[in-house]
């Protein structure tokens, strides 16, 4: 049994190459109807070099039509420069404007602070720079189409520019949330709930069945913890990624310091090599934030802080007395946050606040279990005496937000990604429990491991739209409509051939047939024979040569020793041309037909020729407006209101009533008619 072509198959495959029962290196492959899409292309924060990549070796990058990046975090876009520059990928890549602006600086920082040899680096600063030219931008809610794949995006909350992508292939809709948050915070709007219900929902499961504490309570706990650390003369370290939650925490701290004058002498530093560039991006893209920020920008820019200074490196840091430092990266793997942590961890007055989600295998995750000692980057063992607090500002959905989002959309299939194995399993079980007694809503929940494919079947109806000329008139019941069926990507149209150039990129071609046939007989014999057969023969003159138009489509031109047929090739015209050819060959090859035909038509053809030429002659004498044909056997000449009629068969001329006394007109017409007849009559 022959395999079904991928484009005709009803099978849809979803395969995580990363973020399958793990957090990190998000990369989901979608295959349907011969199209392949990659959703995100991240790295694993807890791994290095090639080990941090998704399982790209399981696919052929050249087959990917479209790559969509949900947001700028490294676990969602960190492998993108490598994929665009080091593989055979030739498809198109899209992300939002804000994501592209921040991607450039965030990955530049990643390249600089990575603590691995140049040989193990996935890509260079040059690769990153060149990858920018291959990335296209999309506005929120803007519909685009690539290779028959329609897609658009919604606000996802989470971070500035984060997007959820709705993808439609052959009528099947899939929503990929990326990382999203349904809770509005100080600067970001909550994730939108699409008004279109998807058939498949690929959704993050980072927090599983956990419920977040209320925003107000969380902010108060955070501010109190920071206040306690500086009150005891300590230094507060808040490891964050340069962009994302950092801006939210800066807004909170700046407002808290403003309301507490006793803290004004204690400095807050935003320690990132990207600090200045990042804040410029945030100050630019305020229109992508929530209403509160957009209203405030009319008075002052909330991202121009009063109590926070930028700290580019440790060289510029005067580490004397209590202070608060927000430093990147967020999981304390390397960079400024790692330097400060190793410098401060032995003093019990100091404190570290973990404010975001931590991936397994990172130092941030390790210290949350409060070990007695830690290992420095140089391999030295240090006692951990500073306080460790975990206050999650991670803008991911909790169980309540996730379940409400699913309840609003009611997708038949839910695919869980971006969650640790146990958290994901608990979320899957909770969702199944929620809908097991609901007869109206049937939802299948899947939680595939990395490289494991989820296979779904979608059998869509094929509808063809009648367009253009064929759609001008409403068809009646039982009427047959015929045209050309045009398939473009996954859309079918029925068109008239004349509309092809209007509705498609197809060019219309015509084939002109020319056929020469030997013929030596009188040309008028062909006229007679074809007229007798078809009743549809028109006399023409082409380049001063006698010609006939038969069936309104076949042109017959007299040439010396032959006739030439011309027509536009199509099934009906070809059939007409065969008929005309048969008649010509029959007249040419059969002397009896020619002799009999001459006798039958000589008189008729003589009258025909005589009539035409007499009309021309009289027009030359009296003027074109004075001569008219009454019927096949009568010509009329009218001069100064007097009319003379000529009987072409008898050549008799009679004047109409009131014109009898004008003998001169009658005699003049009669003489002209007689002389022409004598000139045309052959001498035997």
From Swiss-Prot:
Cofactor stoichiometry and binding remark: Binds 2 Zn(2+) ions per subunit.
Cell compartments where the protein resides: Nucleus
Residues engaged in binding Zn(2+) 1: 71, 73, 158, 179
EC number in record: 3.1.27.-
Positions of the catalytic residues: 396 (proton donor)
In-chain residues carrying the UniProt-annotated modification Phosphothreonine: 681
SMART domains: Beta-Casp, CPSF73-100_C, Lactamase_B
Record's function text: Component of the cleavage and polyadenylation specificity factor (CPSF) complex that plays a key role in pre-mRNA 3'-end formation, recognizing the AAUAAA signal sequence and interacting with poly(A) polymerase and other factors to bring about cleavage and poly(A) addition. Has endonuclease activity, and functions as an mRNA 3'-end-processing endonuclease. Also involved in the histone 3'-end pre-mRNA processing.
Protein name, as recorded: Cleavage and polyadenylation specificity factor subunit 3
Designated gene of the protein: Cpsf3
């Amino acid at each position: 049994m022959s395999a079904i072509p991928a484009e005709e198959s009803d099978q849809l495959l979803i395969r995580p190459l990363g973020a399958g029962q793990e957090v990190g290196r998000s990369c989901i492959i979608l295959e349907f109807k011969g199209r392949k899409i990659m959703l995100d292309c991240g790295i694993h924060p807890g791994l290095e070099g090639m080990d941090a990549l998704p399982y790209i070796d399981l696919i052929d990058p050249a087959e990917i039509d479209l790559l969509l990046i949900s947001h700028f975090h490294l676990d969602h876009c960190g492998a993108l420069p490598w994929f665009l520059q080091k593989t055979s990928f030739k498809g198109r890549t899209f992300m939002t404007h804000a994501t592209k602006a921040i991607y450039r600086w965030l990955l530049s920082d990643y390249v600089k602070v990575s603590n691995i040899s140049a040989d193990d680096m996935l890509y260079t600063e040059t690769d990153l720079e060149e990858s920018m030219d291959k990335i296209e931008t999309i506005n929120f809610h803007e519909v685009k189409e690539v290779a028959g794949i329609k897609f658009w995006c919604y606000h996802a909350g989470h971070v500035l520019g984060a997007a959820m992508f709705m993808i439609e292939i052959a009528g099947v809709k899939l929503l990929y949330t990326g990382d999203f948050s349904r809770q509005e915070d100080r600067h970001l709007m909550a994730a939108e709930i699409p008004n279109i219900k998807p058939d498949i929902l690929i959704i993050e499961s980072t927090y599983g069945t956990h419920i977040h504490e209320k925003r107000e309570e969380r902010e108060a706990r955070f501010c109190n913890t920071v206040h306690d650390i500086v009150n005891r003369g300590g230094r507060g370290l808040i490891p964050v990624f340069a962009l994302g939650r950092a801006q939210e925490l800066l807004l909170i701290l700046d407002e808290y310091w403003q309301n507490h004058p006793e803290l004004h002498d204690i400095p807050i530093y935003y320690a990132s090599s990207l600090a200045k560039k990042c804040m410029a991006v945030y100050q630019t893209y305020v229109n992508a934030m929530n209403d509160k920020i957009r209203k405030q920008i009319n008075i002052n820019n909330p991202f121009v802080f009063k109590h926070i200074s930028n700290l580019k490196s440790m060289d510029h840091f005067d580490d004397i007395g209590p202070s608060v430092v927000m430093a990147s990266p967020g999981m304390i793997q390397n960079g400024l946050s790692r330097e400060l942590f190793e410098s401060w961890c032995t003093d019990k007055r100091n404190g570290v606040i973990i404010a975001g989600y931590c991936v397994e295998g990172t130092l941030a995750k390790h210290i949350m279990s409060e070990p007695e000692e830690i290992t420095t980057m140089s391999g030295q063992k240090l006692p951990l005496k500073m306080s460790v607090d975990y206050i999650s500002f991670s803008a991911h959905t909790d169980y309540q937000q996730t379940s409400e989002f699913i309840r609003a959309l009611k997708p038949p299939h839910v695919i869980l990604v971006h969650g640790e194995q146990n958290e994901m399993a608990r979320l899957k079980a909770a969702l199944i429990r929620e809908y097991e007694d609901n007869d109206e809503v049937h939802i299948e929940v899947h939680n595939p491991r990395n490289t494991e494919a989820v296979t779904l079947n979608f059998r869509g109806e094929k509808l063809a739209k009648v367009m253009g000329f064929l759609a001008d008139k409403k068809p009646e019941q039982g009427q047959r409509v015929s045209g050309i069926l045009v398939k473009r990507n996954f859309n079918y149209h029925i068109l008239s051939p004349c509309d092809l150039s209007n509705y498609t990129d197809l060019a219309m071609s015509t084939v002109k047939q020319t056929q020469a046939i030997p013929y030596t007989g009188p040309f008028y014999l062909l006229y007679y024979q074809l007229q007798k057969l078809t009743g549809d023969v028109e006399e023409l003159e082409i380049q001063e040569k006698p010609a006939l138009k038969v069936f309104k489509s076949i042109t017959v031109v007299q040439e010396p020793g032959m006739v030439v047929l011309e027509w536009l090739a199509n099934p009906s015209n070809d059939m007409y041309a065969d008929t005309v050819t048969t008649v010509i060959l029959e007249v040419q090859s059969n002397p009896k037909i020619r002799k009999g035909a001459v006798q039958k038509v000589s008189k008729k053809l003589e009258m025909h020729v005589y009539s035409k030429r007499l009309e021309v002659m009289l027009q030359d004498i009296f003027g074109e407006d004075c001569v008219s044909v009454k019927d096949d056997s009568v010509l009329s000449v009218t001069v100064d209101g007097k009319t003379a009629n000529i009987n072409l068969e008898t050549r008799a001329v009679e004047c109409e009533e009131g014109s009898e006394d004008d003998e001169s007109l009658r005699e003049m017409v009669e003489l002209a008619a007689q002389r022409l007849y004598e000139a045309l009559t052959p001498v035997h």
